[in-house]
């Protein structure tokens, strides 16, 4: 059976530190390794950060939340 590498995409608002992103990558990788039974080298993670003006919840842009 051909091994298919898992690609995980994480979308979140800007503001996390580099250390937080490292920790996220490590923990997500470990979870995928344990559940998908694949080597950690096969796990790919894409982190996409959004500006606060590009995310809305309940019809309100995140940048307008506290106005």
Set out the residue ranges of the language-model regions.
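A domain-level signal for the structural core that forms small-molecule/cofactor-binding pockets
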Residues: 2-67
């Amino acid at each position: 059976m051909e091994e298919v590498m898992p690609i995980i995409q994480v979308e979140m608002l800007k503001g996390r530190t580099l250390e937080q992103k490292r920790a996220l990558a490590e923990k997500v990788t470990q979870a995928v390794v344990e559940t998908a039974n694949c080597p950690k080298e096969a796990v790919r993670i894409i982190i996409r950060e959004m500006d606060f003006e590009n995310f809305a919840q309940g019809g309100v842009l995140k940048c307008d939340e506290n106005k």
